[in-house]
Amino acid sequence: MKYIFVTGGVVSSLGKGITSSSLGRLLKARGLNVNMIKIDPYLQIDAGTMSPFEHGEVFVTDDGGETDLDLGNYERFVDIGLKADNNITTGKIYWSVLSKERKGDYLGKTVQVIPHITNEIKDRIKNLGKESDITIIEIGGTVGDIESLPFLEAIRQFKKDVGKENVLYIHVSLLPYIRSAGELKTKPTQHSVKELKGIGIQPDILVCRSEIPISEKIKDKLALFCDVEKEAVIECKDARTIYEVPLNLEKEGLGKLVTEKLNLRDSTPDLTEWRAIVDRIINPMNEITIGIVGKYIELKDSYMSIMEALGHAGAKNDTKVNIAWINSEELETKNYEEILNKMVDDEKLHGILVPGGFGDRGIDGKVNAVRYAREKNIPFLGICLGMQCAVIEFARHVCGLNANSTEFDEETEHPVIDYIPEQREVTEKGGTMRLGAYPAVLTENSLASELYGSINASERHRHRYEVNPEYHEILKKNGLIISGMSPDGKLAEFIELENHKYFIATQAHPEFKSRPNKPHPLFHGLVKASIEK
């Protein structure tokens, strides 16, 4: 078992996640079994209760983990399924250690950061790496952050625990480009490596993020001052698409270098399919715009997996998918139709997607967007809350009901959306929703079954509310097709409309299972329908 630790320096949001994911892809392309771990130094147990404005998307795993969005990149790049345990947080570590202390597991010893916290960190990493050839562990944050210190100490000890031949340290750092001087500056990276060495970690490989190519002179300088071999100074310049990064890093020799340093048999990586995907992304034949009607559009990372799923579907259809970010609150006015008409007339809206979310802010704008898509025959995909908004819209404007969700109005006359029965008595917020993968049975000859190519589907979920079963019949009687149900026949999983270009919604989050090489069928269908005139 081999372990690769990826740290970051100078600034955050540098691309450690994409670098780690890209390396995972290169190693998997060499036939190695790869696992991925993200360490987040915040005190939450998981990402489930964090604001999308602060942390971006909550990525849900099959086993119901509410995790950091980087796990989504790992799954997409490496094409693997991860679990809740693949996201380690400070909160999880301290919770576990303190629980053991209360049970008396430490036999009266003084519980300290070293060795108890660091041992807990190491044990989790080792347990997760048991079934893999290589485990890549990304350390969140930046070297120098006080929150990261216990994790950095733990990974420092790792080399001694498992043998230096089984451990590799990769440091991702920024080379700022001073445009007025036309120069890349190495000093911030030198200081970052110095700080890392002060903790006791000597990087084996330096991955340098930059806007422009790195000269041989700069590589020589970094090799000298950071005490790494010149061939271990890897250029990682800005790419045209994140999916081009593995190809750029392979060209720089990162995959070969890693296998050599870990004494693994190197082989020519099979990146044929990956190159074809990147080529289709970079050289599209068509171009469309999908409007995402959201509540958290100020931070685009809130919809990371949706953006990527649209990109995957676009590549499959040789189409560039532009995104028009539409603030749902702006569609709550009476002139919402005028706003959307102008976008359609200007060729800036070919399809509409209403994503998930929580709370009543901007809900009527989402409902109006659904109504516009339904009445104007605009391709539409609703996800989670988006499906609930589609049901509310249909109940109001087709069934003639004064309908709403009890999430937004507890006294609504017609609660077409209501709590899942099991959720009624739940009081705690964290980790208590209907989470993870659940199966659905699709109606034969429905749009859903046609898209999936089967009457069985499994998707990941994150919700407390459902389409109220008491209203299923009146909705169906008025033309709404409930085309997917939970196996027990109680919970509506998919809805759709007949005689519409493309109108489908799901209670699930299909975006989490889309891959560059396997676009999700619901997104593929949306893009395909939006291309057609």
Curated annotation (Swiss-Prot):
Listed PROSITE patterns: GATASE_TYPE_1
Pfam families reported in the protein's UniProt record: CTP_synth_N, GATase
E.C. designation(s): 6.3.4.2
Keyword terms of this UniProt record: ATP-binding, Glutamine amidotransferase, Ligase, Magnesium, Metal-binding, Nucleotide-binding, Pyrimidine biosynthesis
Region Amidoligase domain, residue ranges: 1-264
Domain Glutamine amidotransferase type-1: 289-533
InterPro entries per the UniProt record, alphabetical: Class_I_gatase-like, CTP_synthase, CTP_synthase_N, GATASE, GATase1_CTP_Synthase, P-loop_NTPase
Keyword Magnesium: yes
Residues where ATP binds: 13-18, 70, 237-239
Group of enzyme by EC: ligase
GO cellular component terms listed in the entry, alphabetical order: cytosol
Activity control, per UniProt: Allosterically activated by GTP, when glutamine is the substrate; GTP has no effect on the reaction when ammonia is the substrate. The allosteric effector GTP functions by stabilizing the protein conformation that binds the tetrahedral intermediate(s) formed during glutamine hydrolysis. Inhibited by the product CTP, via allosteric rather than competitive inhibition.
Protein's job: Catalyzes the ATP-dependent amination of UTP to CTP with either L-glutamine or ammonia as the source of nitrogen. Regulates intracellular CTP levels through interactions with the four ribonucleotide triphosphates.
UniProt subunit comment: Homotetramer.
HAMAP family registered for this protein in UniProt: PyrG
Miscellaneous section: CTPSs have evolved a hybrid strategy for distinguishing between UTP and CTP. The overlapping regions of the product feedback inhibitory and substrate sites recognize a common feature in both compounds, the triphosphate moiety. To differentiate isosteric substrate and product pyrimidine rings, an additional pocket far from the expected kinase/ligase catalytic site, specifically recognizes the cytosine and ribose portions of the product inhibitor.
PANTHER family: CTP SYNTHASE (PTHR11550), CTP SYNTHASE-RELATED (PTHR11550:SF0)
Protein name stated in the entry: CTP synthase
Species this chain originates from: Methanococcus maripaludis (strain DSM 14266 / JCM 13030 / NBRC 101832 / S2 / LL)
